[in-house]
Amino acid sequence: MATEQRPFQLVVFGASGFTGQFVTEEVAREQMASEQSSRLPWAVAGRSKEKLQQVLEKAAQKLGRATLSSEVGIIICDISNPASLDEMAKKATLVLNCVGPYRFYGEPVVKACIENGTSCIDICGEPQFLELMHVKYHEKAAEKGVYIIGSSGFDSIPADLGVLYTRNQMNGTLTAVESFLTINSGPEGLCIHDGTWKSAIYGFGDKGSLRKLRSVSNLKPVPVIGSKLKRRWPVSYCRELNSYAIPFLGSDMSVVKRTQRYLHENLEDSPVQYAAYITVGGITSVIKLMFAGLFFLFFVKFSIGRQLLVKFPWLFSFGYFSKRGPTQKQMDESSFTMTFFGQGYSHGVSAEKNKPNIRICTQVKGPEAGYVATPIAMVQAAVTFLNDASDLPKGGGVFTPGAAFSRTKLIDRLNQHGIQFSVISSSEV
């Protein structure tokens, strides 16, 4: 509930950025769909008042709500000015942080939110940042009773909650899951804003930091229940989907593993093994992708190479990334499907002495991943946080979406907003 000290329940930070403008629009859409009595006071935040006003005016025009600009607060805030971050945090119950790459701009927001007793949700897909924030700030956030919830966009809500959904739908104990992401596009093809491209460049260019972080974490291994999940080759064929697949290099593996660790250590849930892949079509696509991948991995090793990759995203990504991002038509014609193949054991069957005897297939389907599904996921995570507080982990801390929302109604809300979870098949073998 908003108070005189905290006039806004929700603040969208980075609202004038490429992704932030879509998150702003989605918050406005959610507010319009709510009854008057349940609408939340909210604001947008960023460096330029003029740009923030333009974002609100654009959303107002698109949604047909002429009064939107007068209904939403504006906070001037700069990532390079800690005092302005503090002032923003003091005015909000929850900050939706849309400013990336997070490895460069994320930590000051996390720090300001914790110091000022404000919770924060981001849409980061960078494992190094996500894991570092947990190591550095989990205890501090818990002491303050605030929640820092990362990767609450397309990275990695479909994967993280998809595994939990699969577990909940299995009539037995789920022990292992493989997910296969398929991106669908229309005649005009796919295009992704270069902010995601930059995050990938700097992430691959600094893989050593993530390895070092994990090596000093001293975490106990999570037990393997049942048959060990075999990793596929770098290029494998998925017969069920009639497509070649490669490992998915986003944050899904990191996030799901952290969720499974949390649920096992804190709620005594049986941990689930996980592997993430993305389908790439036929053999011609595989060959093209191999050349592109080798090209990228060579350039990303060197400073000058990274500068070239950042400067010419369209050239080096073969047209998939650009500084302008996708057109509205490209977004309208795009969608994603994430298919989960799970295995486990029926009740009463020992996982120690037997092979898995249950198979289950589930799917998560949704609209364009980066700028339609991501805002939906982020905003519904925020709505869930604000409305299902009693079902969140007790005491605060730094969490994955699955750890934070495993006992909430987030999946139900996503189903109602176009990100659909469903069971395709389930059988004993």
From Swiss-Prot:
Q: Phosphoserine modification sites?
A: S209, S215, S217
What biological-process terms (Gene Ontology) are attached? glycolipid biosynthetic process
Q: Name one GO cellular component term.
A: lipid droplet
Tell me which UniProt keywords the record has, alphabetically. Answer: Acetylation, Oxidoreductase, Phosphoprotein
InterPro entries given in the database record: NAD(P)-bd_dom_sf, Saccharopine_DH-like_oxidrdct, Sacchrp_dh_NADP-bd
A GO molecular function assigned to this protein is:
oxidoreductase activity
Alphabetized SUPFAM superfamilies for the sequence = NAD(P)-binding Rossmann-fold domains (SSF51735)
Q: Which domain of life is it from?
A: Eukaryota
Q: Modified residue N-acetylalanine is at which positions?
A: A2
Q: Which Gene3D superfamilies match?
A: NAD(P)-binding Rossmann-like Domain
Pfam family of the protein (one): Sacchrp_dh_NADP
Keyword Ubl conjugation set for record: no
The UniProt record lists the EC number as 1.-.-.-
Which family is this sequence assigned to?
A: Belongs to the saccharopine dehydrogenase family.
Protein name as it appears in the record: Saccharopine dehydrogenase-like oxidoreductase
* Annotated source species: Rattus norvegicus (Rat)
The gene coding this protein: Sccpdh
